[in-house]
Amino acid sequence: MVEGNALRVKGRVLYLTADSKLLTRQLSGETLKFDPSIALIDNISTDELTPGWVCYYYDETLARYCLIGLRGGTIQKDAIRDGGFEVVVSGASKGCGSSRETAPYSEVAAGIRVVIARSIEKIYAQNAQNIGLLLSTDFSLLPRIERGEEIPIEEFTRGLDPISAAIVASGGLFAYNRARMAGRVSPPPTETPARPMTIAEKIIARHAVSQGMSAHGAMAVAPGDALFARADVRFSHEYVTPMADALFRAGFGQDAKIAEPESVYAFRDHLTFLDLVMPKAHVEMGLRDQAASLATTQERVATAQGIRLYGEVTRDGKPAGSEGICHNKVIEDIALPGQLVIGSDSHTCMAGALGCLAFGVGATDLANAWFTRDVRLKVPETVRFVLAGRLAPGVCAKDVMLHLLCQPFWRSGRGIGKVLEFTGEGTFALPLDERATLTNMAVEAGGFTGIIEADEAIVSYLVAQRGLAAADVRARIVKSDPGAAYVESFDIDLAAVEPMVALPGDPRNGIPLRQLRDESGGDVRIDIAYGGSCTGGKKSDMDMYASVLGAALARGQRVSPSVKLYVQFGSQDIRKYAEEKGYLDTFEKAGVLLVEPSCGACIRAGPGVSLGPDEVTVSAINRNFPGRSGPGKVYLASPLVVAASAIAGKIVHPVDLEPSPPGLR
């Protein structure tokens, strides 16, 4: 319990050990003492803390399912809640993946007060701080906790920026913001003198909020500065809107109103096709009705608050999916260069392809931003990637990201919380959709976000897509200053990047595709090929699927009888594009199972999910953490490899199909 400014742990410590038998013994009542030689589980994702189906709940019920998705299946319902644990200990990269606040919330609800890990991912850490869950990477605390010592709260604020430290000391973000609005506390003034800044730093400086909660901007900011920044765009989807609404009303009053609702958006995109794949056991648990309630609650919130809801659509009188995945629609309809965009999803960073600063937040951050219009952040360091040359035929941006993610800088955790800025003539030679793949997957590196300076290609896109005036778009463009400081800079020769595949379990498990047979001891046969999601359901992705499948049809080939190939559109605009290009006919003739716009299989909520642990999927989505798209194994690859593998029945590149498609030889 917390007594004044100190914590005394009365409950047990749970070590999430790599040895499943040792973990089972702890769950059965054995007390394990701290031993630095015992291997702990690394890369525990938020999907493992609270699998997608657990997120249909957003109350104390979450306590019953804490860590139920942990690899190996050792932890069962109620095990954490009923185990008397107050401390959970794990290895590196705790809380990677999704921005879902249900993950730390389930820990708190189950009685956990302290999380200790070798390293902790940025969004998970901020969500935990917001709800009063104490975090540390200092393993020397464990013997002290086991001895029953009082641990000063300062041990959990050491190294934090002043705002984060104050939030932790306050017990969470709502308590801090109530004090801030009442004038009882103030964030530190931003007093950094003029200096050369990166794109991200410039956008943050322009959106900085003064101590009086007005958006006056700052002369300059530098990495480490703590501040609140005014958000131009705030959005959420049905997975998070209900939880954010419950927190919003509890924190600010049942009749509280969202400030500037015209800049707030809601999306029905994640669970549109859940009924098609919900396991019988989940139906029997009542989860169908629970999941359906998320959509109806979001509709109620949107109506009551006057915010724009991107909902479901019909075609010829029949259901036709969602208007679009939030990230695709934010690029198509909403975000602009130079803006600050927050969303209730870790892949909000995809909009950075337009030259805006876009990043994911949890439900508590979002609920507070609905009221205050601002979001707290610590100015992140920036890593620069200078892309030179051109990609070889048959290689695309997905391969670039899988190549980058497997590098030591990211695998070691040194990139956690960094901005990934992509630049160089190789970057600007890529079309918007391919740039969006780069920024989308920045979070897979543990990054804060990804960003690319807007250029004439972006100006032309926004003029054509939205009818904006070119001069107005150009006036919004933000560029890094000469002499801006980067914590690291990497030069990438695009011509040297080769087709990649990420082995199951983590998008950072990338290897060159040519090594897959040796790595796996033979061909990797597949049951499912999935092309969709915000990452793999864009217009350029449709071009790639169609190029491979069209060439296959010309050779008299179709999707292998042993494989189901799903192609799912990221939005109705993308579906219309595919139809106008004649791709729908190509897909149907090739044996593709077409799926209307929605997140679908990426979130284990639509056609394309695996149904058993022995099924193997090759997928164009962005992450393959255990359980993410079903119980089977998921390999990540480019749209080209996904389509070719569906034809071959095993993971291959299009050049391995005989004869190879035109332009890929």
Question: Where do the protein language model's features map onto the residues?
Answer:
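Fe-S-dependent hydro-lyases/dehydratases of central metabolism
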Residues: 1-665
